Amino acid sequence: MLLLLYICCLFLKFILANVDLTFVEYAKLPSKYAELLANATNQQGVMLFSTGDIRIGAYNYLVNNVTEINNDTDAYLCQLLTGQYTTDCYIFDTNSDDKPETFNSSIHLLNSDLDPK
C-alpha cells in the first residue's frame, strides 16, 4: 500500500514538475503574450496549441526572433499559431483594420504592446 502511494506521489510530482516548467517559461513573457498563447483558439473554439512543445516554440519565436516586424514575421508566427502558412494573417500590423483577419480577434493584444526596437 505504501509502495502504491509512493508511486502515485512520484507520478503527481512528475506531472507538476512539467507544469511548473511551462509556467516558468510563460513567466518570461509579458502577461498579455502569455495569456494569448495559453488561450488562443480558432474561430470554432478549438485550442490552437495542442501540445506544450508548440506553445514553447511560439514563445521562443516571440522572445528571440521578433526584432523586425514585417509580413514574414506575421506569416511565420501565424504558421506557429495555426499550423498554416498564410500571408493574410497580420498579427503585428498596427493598421490591421484594412486587412483580412484570419486569426482569433484576441490577437490585437499584441499590437498595442509590441515595441520593436
Swiss-Prot record:
Glycosylated sites: 39, 65, 71, 104
UniProt feature coiled coil, ranges: none
Cystines in this chain: none
One Pfam family in the UniProt entry: DUF2430
Signal peptide: 1-17
Nucleotide-binding keyword on record: no
InterPro entries: UPF0321
GO cellular component terms listed in the entry, alphabetical order: cytoplasm
Entry keyword set: Glycoprotein, Signal
Recorded family membership: Belongs to the UPF0321 family.
Protein's recorded name: UPF0321 protein PJ695.01c
Species of origin: Schizosaccharomyces pombe (strain 972 / ATCC 24843) (Fission yeast)
